[in-house]
Amino acid sequence: WGIYTLPQVNETDGSYQNYIIEDEDSVVRRWLRLGASGWRLDVADELPDSFIQKLNAAARREKSDALIIGEVWEDASNKISYSERRRYFQGGELDSVMNYPLRDAIFGFLNGGTAEHFAESMECIRENYPRDVFYNLMNVVGTHDTARALTLLGVTENEWEMDRNGRAHYQLPPDRLEIALRRLRMAAVIQFTMPGSPTIYYGDEAGQQGFEDPFNRQTYPWGHENQELLAFYRRLCEIRAEEQTLADGDLQFSDT
């Protein structure tokens, strides 16, 4: 990635696999013993299938219900990377993935797209993914790799042309902030009512703004949260916990 602090490793090297996966005190096994529930594999496309298979097996030996989720931005059922079709969902690799297609569909819909296109996008994922994968998707609206949801839902196209200093200090004007907040509530409702696990990027629930990395990674706004938005997210969490249908019910889109 051109970042000198990130080491380039050979994932097929035996000593590296022992350190990360196989040894009794490997990274994967040690943290599972200490209470981790599973692992999210950053940029799963960069990891060989054989490496993911060994990691999955080692995690299962340590904790039978360990969850292995991959960062895949596209439809992971037919992903091709480095000219090879990946086998993520053919058993023994990923339990599920980050649901970037849902995120893309939400923003497309709320920024002027059609409900039909949103439904088609979700039906495509449902048809392509195994049921257990679909119901364990990591449903995201914001992540550390994307501009803040609130910013994306209120910014104009021209404002993306601002220089780095302008983007670093940008805040939505009051009129567009109100529109963006309404859209974010709609996005959250969709996120919390779709099959999968709604996953909040810290600060989104508090109304945090910011363009792309590093402006989307500021510290949490302790003492300056949008209390109305925070209460809205808390209520969504309560409803999600109370209504089992939202976790394992069937999904059906209806024309109105």
Model regions: which residues?
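Carbohydrate-binding surface patches
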Residues: 253-256
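Short clusters of hydrophobic/aromatic residues that line enzyme substrate/ligand-binding pockets
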Residues: 9, 98, 149, 220-222, ...
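The substrate-binding groove and active-site-proximal loops of carbohydrate-active enzymes
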Residues: 2-21, 36-46, 103-115, 168-179, ...
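Active-site-proximal helices and loops of the catalytic beta/alpha 8
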Residues: 27, 37, 42-137, 190, ...
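Surface-exposed helix-capping loop/turn segments at secondary-structure junctions
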Residues: 35-37, 197, 241-251
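Substrate-binding/active-site clefts of carbohydrate-active enzymes
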Residues: 1-34, 55-61, 78-79
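Substrate-binding clefts and catalytic carboxylate motifs of secreted carbohydrate-active enzymes
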Residues: 122-212, 227-228, 242-243
